[in-house]
Amino acid sequence: MPEMPEVETVRRTLLPLIKGKTIEKVVLWYPTIVATDHDEFLKELPGKKIIGIDRYAKYLLIRLSDNLTIVSHLRMEGKYHLTTEDAPKDKHDHVEFVFTDKTALRYNDVRKFGRMQLIITGTERQVTGIKKLGPEPNTSEFSQQYLIDNLKKKHKNIKNVLLDQTTVAGLGNIYVDETLWQSKIHPLSIANKIPAKKVAGLWENINQTIALAIEKRGTTVHSYLDANGEVGGYQEMLQVYGHVGEECPRCGNIFEKIKVSGRGTTFCPHCQVIYK
């Protein structure tokens, strides 16, 4: 699943491709992708101009004229690509926005898990899935003290807590494994048993890792591509994710893999301390 750095990279690469274009028509090849009323989606969008793209956590917010916004969640394998109206349709293209210049933005999704909805701009924090999200890394709301205080209330393993988007928004399996390894914290550690000093280090590692991953244009380990069809670069910097059975570069012990609430989790059993 694209995590926050990947979605931010999609936003940055998609914006110059479509900003200023006017929608002429919309085609729904697989209507289920649109979670709101299909007829309204098809009726309201023609004539609307793309004025910008924002992002919150893993959600793209495509801003339109007349105070409308398309909220788009890529889920597991959603992608956008710009083509022309007459270009052959890929079997996994499910939604098409045809512009007045006859270019077309297509949403492609092998798994068909992604969703879009049309809302009034400014109401995105009322959208199911967004309204309960916690703060993003590298924001004033995600302070060191916030994370320390939040973890004190959680008697769950730290991996689950960090994947819970109500604690911190935008993290997924890759960056949680990486930041826990950087912080020398075992993924099965109970959140409220981790010393405050270690939580402070975790907070710093989360912020630094997400910032660097955005700088490197995200991580491609499966199918992620940006809006230009290019892979990310952070996969070359992964220290633990995807390295099960290899030596830990810090201590030389062998990385192991376990399941934590159904999620594959790679860690070093020697230098990642378990707090219980």
Swiss-Prot record:
GO biological process: base-excision repair
Positions annotated as zinc finger (FPG-type): 239-273
Record keyword Protein transport present: no
CDD domains assigned to the protein according to its UniProt record, in alphabetical order: EcFpg-like_N (cd08966)
Keyword Chaperone: no
Binding sites annotated in the UniProt record for DNA: H92, R111, K154
SUPFAM superfamilies per UniProt: Glucocorticoid receptor-like (DNA-binding domain), N-terminal domain of MutM-like DNA repair proteins, S13-like H2TH domain
SMART domains per record: Fapy_DNA_glyco (SM00898), H2TH (SM01232)
Keywords, comma-separated and alphabetical: DNA damage, DNA repair, DNA-binding, Glycosidase, Hydrolase, Lyase, Metal-binding, Multifunctional enzyme, Zinc, Zinc-finger
Cofactor dependence: Zn(2+)
Active site: residue positions: P2 (schiff-base intermediate with dna), E3 (proton donor), K58 (proton donor), R263 (proton donor)
GO molecular-function terms, A-Z: 8-oxo-7,8-dihydroguanine DNA N-glycosylase activity; class I DNA-(apurinic or apyrimidinic site) endonuclease activity; damaged DNA binding; zinc ion binding
Cofactor: record remark: Binds 1 zinc ion per subunit.
InterPro entries: DNA_glyclase/AP_lyase_DNA-bd (IPR015886), DNA_glyclase_Znf_dom_DNA_BS (IPR015887), Formamido-pyr_DNA_Glyclase (IPR020629), FPG_cat (IPR012319), MutM-like_N-ter (IPR035937), Ribosomal_uS13-like_H2TH (IPR010979), Znf_DNA_glyclase/AP_lyase (IPR000214), Znf_FPG/IleRS (IPR010663)
The organism's place on the tree of life at top rank: Bacteria
Catalysed reactions, as listed in the record: Hydrolysis of DNA containing ring-opened 7-methylguanine residues, releasing 2,6-diamino-4-hydroxy-5-(N-methyl)formamidopyrimidine; 2'-deoxyribonucleotide-(2'-deoxyribose 5'-phosphate)-2'-deoxyribonucleotide-DNA = a 3'-end 2'-deoxyribonucleotide-(2,3-dehydro-2,3-deoxyribose 5'-phosphate)-DNA + a 5'-end 5'-phospho-2'-deoxyribonucleoside-DNA + H(+)
EC number: 3.2.2.23, 4.2.99.18
Entry function: Involved in base excision repair of DNA damaged by oxidation or by mutagenic agents. Acts as a DNA glycosylase that recognizes and removes damaged bases. Has a preference for oxidized purines, such as 7,8-dihydro-8-oxoguanine (8-oxoG). Has AP (apurinic/apyrimidinic) lyase activity and introduces nicks in the DNA strand. Cleaves the DNA backbone by beta-delta elimination to generate a single-strand break at the site of the removed base with both 3'- and 5'-phosphates.
Binding partners and assembly: Monomer.
HAMAP family tied to this protein: Fapy_DNA_glycosyl
UniProt family annotation: Belongs to the FPG family.
UniProt-recorded name of the protein: Formamidopyrimidine-DNA glycosylase
